[in-house]
């Protein structure tokens, strides 16, 4: 993990919190609420961009976590099958920890900004079951997306994997609104994983009346847990087949 990249991500969170405090002086954690479906196109794109800035910054930190390390000094050390499994699993564990730090940092920064703008803020009105569930969904969704980015690095260059994830996130958030307008079957929304992180789209947010719930929270939680387990297993299986010495696996 690159320290410089995480510092840039921290700056991006502060930037996000600063702009959010001007746009909304009541919502303490707007990044957990996400983007409402029932907004104008211009306002929607503005919200998506603001929500996405820290996430895309963090994606640069994760980019190359498997591919670059594999090509460098780790290549000759990972000849044994046991070492391969242990190493690739450790990469996902690193992501898990870093994303936890990222999420907690985001919560802390936004809370500080809210204390400044809302002097009589009651912590009991903010930290509750809804908040915990939204935070869990947000965290696991990001874990899912960045784990899949690492998984794609086993097949493609790290830049391509990162670009694919970024496009998928933006595409999913925009497409969800179009599908609602077309009255499409709700099952289609479950293929658009980034929406799981938006409280306004799961109905968990206190402001859900201003949006449309398209994801059932418990079902969404079950899906992303199954997906996460599957991504790790598939990554381990793929990595075990790589010929370390000939570098055929990631070339």
Swiss-Prot record:
Source organism: Bacillus subtilis (strain 168)
Cited InterPro entries: DUF2705 (IPR024295)
Protein name, entry field: Uncharacterized protein YybK
Pfam family membership, one: DUF2705
